A protein has these predicted regions:
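Ser/Thr-rich low-complexity repeats and stalk/linker segments
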Residues: 1-161
Length: 161
């Protein structure tokens, strides 16, 4: 079985014998079936209402016409999609916090200040975040601060300014 991507709507793989049935069991216990094609490939749709998340395990077995069942194959779902770049509200000169909006609650925001120092914060349930300006760092008119958002899988967004 190929490693499924978080949020995917299909799971794919390669079987041993064309015409055999593939049964995939999803993390919530639901199953889906597919057939091994002439080229050996198969595809099974993720059932409606089932979501594949980073770290979930998906299993598959192949059954031939005689009812023989293969050993179970297991794949762990991976998340390789970076979050969207966070928005940064323009801070005023002398501000002691930088605020903005992130794309997913719980993600980590890392702000880089003009002097190269960094600070971190967490995206809240409402999508907002705030990061304290490090001690010894002063924001002046025209200074640019950047922010990136990192999800639980370690995917890092583009910079937001």
């Amino acid at each position: 079985m190929n490693v499924p991507e978080a949020g995917a709507d299909t799971v794919t793989g390669t079987g041993d014998e064309p015409g055999n049935t593939i049964t995939v069991t999803f993390p919530d216990g639901t199953t889906g079936t597919g057939t091994v094609g002439e080229d050996g490939s198969w595809s099974v749709e993720v059932p409606e209402g089932t979501e594949l998340n980073n770290g979930d395990e998906v299993t598959a077995v192949e059954t031939d016409d005689a009812g023989n069942v293969s050993n179970e194959g297991t794949a762990t779902v991976v998340d390789t999609t970076a979050p969207e770049a966070p928005t940064v509200n323009v801070p005023e000169a002398g501000a002691d916090t930088v605020t903005g909006t992130g794309s997913e609650p719980g993600n980590t925001i890392t702000v880089t200040f003009p002097d190269g120092t960094t600070g971190t914060g967490t995206v809240g349930e409402d999508g907002s975040w705030s990061v304290e300006v490090p001690e010894g760092t002063e924001l002046n008119n025209g200074d640019e601060v950047t922010a990136v958002e990192t999800d639980d899988a370690g995917n890092v967004s583009n910079e937001g300014t």
